[in-house]
Amino acid sequence: MSHIIELPEMLANQIAAGEVIERPASVVKELVENAIDAGSSQIIIEIEEAGLKKIQITDNGHGIAHDEVELALRRHATSKIKNQADLFRIRTLGFRGEALPSIASVSVLTLLTAVDGASHGTKLVARGGEVEEVIPATSPVGTKVCVEDLFFNTPARLKYMKSQQAELSHIIDIVNRLGLAHPEISFSLISDGKEMTRTAGTGQLRQAIAGIYGLVSAKKMIEIENSDLDFEISGFVSLPELTRANRNYISLFINGRYIKNFLLNRAILDGFGSKLMVGRFPLAVIHIHIDPYLADVNVHPTKQEVRISKEKELMALVSEAIANSLKEQTLIPDALENLAKSTVRNREKVEQTILPLKENTFYYEKTEPSRPSQTEVADYQVELTDEGQDLTLFAKETLDRLTKPAKLHFAERKPANYDQLDHPELDLASIDKAYDKLEREEASSFPELEFFGQMHGTYLFAQGRDGLYIIDQHAAQERVKYEEYRESIGNVDQSQQQLLVPYIFEFPADDALRLKERMPLLEEVGVFLAEYGENQFILREHPIWMAEEEIESGIYEMCDMLLLTKEVSIKKYRAELAIMMSCKRSIKANHRIDDHSARQLLYQLSQCDNPYNCPHGRPVLVHFTKSDMEKMFRRIQENHTSLRELGKY
């Protein structure tokens, strides 16, 4: 029979390391967060062989006193909290005192530090958690932590490390997130002597975004802000024309801490409404300032999961902030820029001789070799990521060689299957209040257009005061009809159209049972089905907004939408129905219309709440300015844009 014993401290630290230190990126995260908590304004991260050989973090923070250096390597020794009350008002990134001893237990760790006013600094060397020496040493104010031979005493962990390229991607992702979280700090990441990422540390979030996403992307992001008594929201989101194939480019920060929160991600998408294409996601960098008492960060070892009080209120604020900022924008894509992007995507090869970083990267002067300020960067045109990408932020774009054109995936519109989302228990009805405020989108000033032609029975040409406009006739009429249906669907007071021959609908037993429970939702949109035999329903009348020839397919699709979700928001349901009906009833491509019909369509479009996107998020029209046309014909030359121009935004 085995007996209960107290584990040795070194073994306990190795066990804790299994939770906190998963890979080299975890070491970078924990050490950089310590540097941030120490009040650093400049942090340099140097790695070799993706961090498995060496990770070195140098900061200019307040350092560690000589008599506290050894104590820093003991479990649960921390300067961040003093008592139980502090645990409910955490204002620092670290607070448990686990990271440094956990890292030391699975590596060879060297720590060099000094505090302001001290006659000398301190050097500590530990191997596998055992302190080998603590000696006085010369050091500038701040701390330098060098971690070598990571996992040397836990070979099983090394077996599960991915390729160096993959591990480096994770490190780049971590540093990028921290750079966006703290634009007031200058970050520099150097891998095997080459600078991979750098932020200026000016305190301007847009400049930090430019350093990570690139200058062109930063210029296509708009500022958002909102607040109430409990929350203060600020940040940037991309215009609908700048999207990615997954949510990995959404960065949320609470009090400077990067978090993952499905409901807040959902609130961001709700703020965009129908302005995004199906399967596309925005770039977003959103800072949320909150009383620490309302956020519990002591939930997960990585501290990326946070429990938030008044979460529904926060969701509404985020959605409202984005929706209000988008209302102020004229969301007509720049046609000339889209043509340029298309040309780059269609290249079969892109010459690349050195490691690519980001589009339109700004440069720093080179100094002597191997100094942190050195950089060697290759410009490239940003490609849209594949939907299967699982590496986050710009890490994958930083590492991949650009030898293939990007693949665009324009998904067919389908009813949303919320059962397959990350949180299948999400109660969509809980955000009805916020969604109701966002459903009505106010139009920005729409240009006065003079129609003069049609091309291929698909595109309308019109002239405005500031140039040429090309309109997708299907998308335009789809938007017009969508807003008409949005008004009429659910108006159950309107008269119903009686059917001479009723329709009978039959469903499998389990679906029929679920439909009985959700029948009130169909009645909310003017569809009254009555039970008729076993697993059958009869329809004797239909709402006037539904054409008789569409009844059978339309009712089945409406029922499918109900069956696909566990919880249904009636506002969402009505919106999906309006999208479905508007798409079916709009003119298609290769359909010629007369001048009167074209002018009438443009007038109806100008009266829409949101005339710039179809309900699926595709652009309705694109714009060539007079300046664009002159550039195309080389009448004028385009000027280069510098980082300093960001101050204009």
UniProtKB/Swiss-Prot annotation:
Note the superkingdom of the native organism: Bacteria
**MF terms per GO, please?**
ATP binding; ATP hydrolysis activity; ATP-dependent DNA damage sensor activity; mismatched DNA binding
Coiled-coil annotation reads: none
Q: Which family does it belong to?
A: Belongs to the DNA mismatch repair MutL/HexB family.
The record ties this protein, via Pfam families, to: DNA_mis_repair, HATPase_c_3, MutL_C
| Xref: CDD domains | HATPase_MutL-MLH-PMS-like, MutL_Trans
Q: What does this protein do?
A: This protein is involved in the repair of mismatches in DNA. It is required for dam-dependent methyl-directed DNA mismatch repair. May act as a 'molecular matchmaker', a protein that promotes the formation of a stable complex between two or more DNA-binding proteins in an ATP-dependent manner without itself being part of a final effector complex.
Q: Which keywords belong to this entry? A: DNA damage, DNA repair
The name under which this protein is listed is: DNA mismatch repair protein MutL
Q: Name one GO cellular component term.
A: mismatch repair complex
GO BP of this protein: mismatch repair
The record's section on InterPro entries has: DNA_mismatch_repair_CS (IPR014762), DNA_mismatch_repair_MutL (IPR020667), DNA_mismatch_S5_2-like (IPR013507), HATPase_C_sf (IPR036890), MutL/Mlh/PMS (IPR002099), MutL/Mlh/Pms-like (IPR038973), MutL_C (IPR014790), MutL_C_dimsub (IPR042120)
